[in-house]
């Protein structure tokens, strides 16, 4: 297995910062960039190197990790005027951890292969806590050479690494399925909490009972405490699920596969975004149900 020493990392957002920090903790030299310069001091204080462009992060790098919002940003990071591929050595591995459509990922894999690079389609799950603790799950696909090159990085960022196939895009298929379930679970948790509260049960009691009952889920246990506290500081924003469930529906259209539950969950997130909640934590969808029903799930209730 080749030894990786210098890593370029693009995207120090809520999850990206934790992921990049885990690489530092595991002995990698990480040069990073983010569009938000306010993260620069914290990154440098943690031992990371700061760059002004994706191209600069890739100079002398053995690999680059991309953790940005969408496929448009991935394209800009890799192929833009100051894109990473202007500096990245041929034969290096490109790891895209962003949530993108399977068809996009498949096309990107072909494009990178033709340009002389290895590619790992490696979306992640586990939230901010998982990123900060190095306990993410990674659902990755790519050729043997890409896995051999990228595995040390994956192991630094995750405790569960699933190799789901050799074809680029299969990792994104699994992430798409995960996001279908995650989005539906969040909206159902919000609906259920508002429903039970409106019917007269103390929301804290309701959460305690359901979290230890068959109707619970990982998302219920993780997001309902945010709802109860009225703390909608974004760990994963409403707008993220507008995008991700949109990808789910796009894949369904490509396959001619009906996705009625995903479509309904998507519309709830769209409604939340339209109500001005897009930048808030995805658990803020509970506000829609509170406003519709008069229920007060949150200890500090507000309309927006």
Each model region followed by its residue ranges:
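Interdomain hinge/lid region at the active-site interface
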Residues: 172, 181, 216-280, 300-301
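Active-site-proximal catalytic alpha-helix in oxidoreductases
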Residues: 133-134, 138-141, 162, 168-199, ...
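NAD(P)+-binding Rossmann beta1-loop-alpha1 motif at the extreme N-terminus of oxidoreductases
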Residues: 1-67, 92, 128
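Rossmann-fold NAD(P) dinucleotide-binding segment
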Residues: 54-118
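Hydrophobic beta-strand scaffold residues
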Residues: 30, 50, 118-120, 161, ...
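Rossmann-fold dinucleotide-binding core
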Residues: 99-183
């Amino acid at each position: 297995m080749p030894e990786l020493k210098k890593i370029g990392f693009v995207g120090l957002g809520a999850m990206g910062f934790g992921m990049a920090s885990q690489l530092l903790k595991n002995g990698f030299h990480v040069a990073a960039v983010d569009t938000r310069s306010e993260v620069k001091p914290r990154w440098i204080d943690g031992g990371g190197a700061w760059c002004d462009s994706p191209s600069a992060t890739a100079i002398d790098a053995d690999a680059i990790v991309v953790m940005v919002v969408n496929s448009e940003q991935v394209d800009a990071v890799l192929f833009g005027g100051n894109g990473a591929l202007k500096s990245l050595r041929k034969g290096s591995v490109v790891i895209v951890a962003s949530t993108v459509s399977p068809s996009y990922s498949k096309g990107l894999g072909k494009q990178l292969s033709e340009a002389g690079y290895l590619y790992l389609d490696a979306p992640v799950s586990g939230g901010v806590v998982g990123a900060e603790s190095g306990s993410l799950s990674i659902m990755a696909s790519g050729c043997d050479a890409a896995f051999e090159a990228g595995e040390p990085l994956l192991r630094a960022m995750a405790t569960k690494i699933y190799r789901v196939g050799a074809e680029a895009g299969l990792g994104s298929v699994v992430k798409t399925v995960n996001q279908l379930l995650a989005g539906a679970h969040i909206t159902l948790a919000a609906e259920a909490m508002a429903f039970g509260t409106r019917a007269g049960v103390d929301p804290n009691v309701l959460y305690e009972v359901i979290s230890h009952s068959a109707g619970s889920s990982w998302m219920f246990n993780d997001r309902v405490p945010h709802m109860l506290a009225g703390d909608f500081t974004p760990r994963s924003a409403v707008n993220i699920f507008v995008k991700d469930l949109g990808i789910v529906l796009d894949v369904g259209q490509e396959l001619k596969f009906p996705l009625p539950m995903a479509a309904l969950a998507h519309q709830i997130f769209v409604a939340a975004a339209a109500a001005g909640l897009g930048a808030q934590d995805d658990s803020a969808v509970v506000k829609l149900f509170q406003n519709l029903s008069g229920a007060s799930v949150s200890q500090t209730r507000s309309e927006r």
